[in-house]
Amino acid sequence: MNFPKYVMTNTNDLDMAIREAKNPMCEWYDANHDDLPYFENIVTGEQFGNYHHTSWSCGHCPGRWAESLFFSQLVTGMELDPVVFQKLKKWVFKVYSNHINLPANIDLNTFELKKEVDLCNLRESFFGLTAVYLYDHDIRVFTIAEKVIATVEKYFDFENGRWDSTAYEEATGAKSVGLFTGDLEQTRFCNTFGRFIGGLVRYYEISHSAAALTLACKLSDVALRSVVLEDGTFDPDRTAAHPYSTTSMLSGIALLADITGDMLLFNRLKSFMENGFYQIAIDTGWVTENLNRTNLVGEINNSCDLLEVCLFLGKAGFSKYYERAEQMLRGHILPSQLLDTCFISDKNYIDDSKNHMARRVKGAFGFPTPYGHEDEPGSVISYNWDIIGGVSGLCWSKCHQTTENNDIYSINLLFDYENHDIKFSSPYQHDDILSIKLRAKKNLRIRLSSRIDLKKLKEELKKSGIIYCILGDWLYLNHLMVGHTYSFCFPFIEEDKEYIFKNHHLTFRWKGDSIIAASSEGKRLCFFQELS
């Protein structure tokens, strides 16, 4: 193994990123314990290997993996291995076989289910139930989901936003724990029922369940009254210091806003992205793993939750949020994917939890810094298997990359794109040259980065003889001939921008919505060339 200054990255190819990210989810199952997925992964140091968790191995990873694998097949056409999916389906159902009406934790000594639920897992278990139904239409999903919803309605106090764990335990014999941030945090709204909103919305989309939609709306009301306030701030006294508690809730509220068109929800999300976001993150898309940290270890789950918020805000008409989404993709999420495993052992171990680690971990997302895989030389590097939010974020990006409304094609995210109507070649991938070819008569608009030289762009378009109109953040090209390829320079502006997070000073060189260099003196495994 070696630890070079720079690692190989991908900042342009969404399909490749999704394809590589599927790899670990097809690999890490414990054959000695009924194919239970692993949760914890450590690729450097003395704790090298994969490990189980009493809650997240059984209640979290199966649902998250099932949803991500099915979603990736849906948006890319990449076939889902049915053997792998059946392993996940087994656990999606198994955690509900303990007669407590909520997803159970597992005893790591006996590997039997416990009379115990980690309320954090409600969202991921519903992701799994939804994916199982979409994949093979198993109607057991509806019976389980409706029982969960009824249980939450019975024991959750919507006035004060608290779970009545005592009454629930008296009725079922099951303890409610808050392993997400420690037992004392079990009544935190964000990391339990707040994050459940997204799972309910995904389930509603397959079931049209009135109970699911009602519960999602009631929980969102609690969120708006107690956590997602008008001022948009991130207050750890309300949310807990672990941002994933909050970001996972925000992505769920964005899903609800999308299906309802509720502008109150969109405006609260927008307020957070303009205020609270900068308490936990920077424009590149990096988000701290925990606000109590003094180092720069982040978490891709957090980044991709907020990416999804940006995508749905963009869809709602706030076009600047498509720019923020592309900056997050190109500036952090894509380059942070583990594609270069030169620093990870690929030894053959008898213990399958360590065997051929480098090959089987490739494609994972984890806890990156703004500049690389490693915080400081010698820091432990981990890719825990709940960080599959990276796949979900990429899949949602594919969905929003190009959209069509009222016979107008919108290029929202400037990645290469091709279908039966259009072929688009991105200037980021082709030396600043944008090319477009219509295969059917369409009106077209392309989102403009705020870092583009409009004067030069107009000169380029005039030189090319292209009829155009610029309105706000959009370049309209409504008179293109079918079958003709139009190519012109898309003149991005380069800008060095400094960010201060706590006591850390970070400088990045932007070109359009991508990063081409960064400050990283003394660091290893870096994503970007060091600023000169």
Predicted regions, residues:
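Glycan-recognition and catalytic cores of secretory/periplasmic carbohydrate-active enzymes
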Residues: 1-532
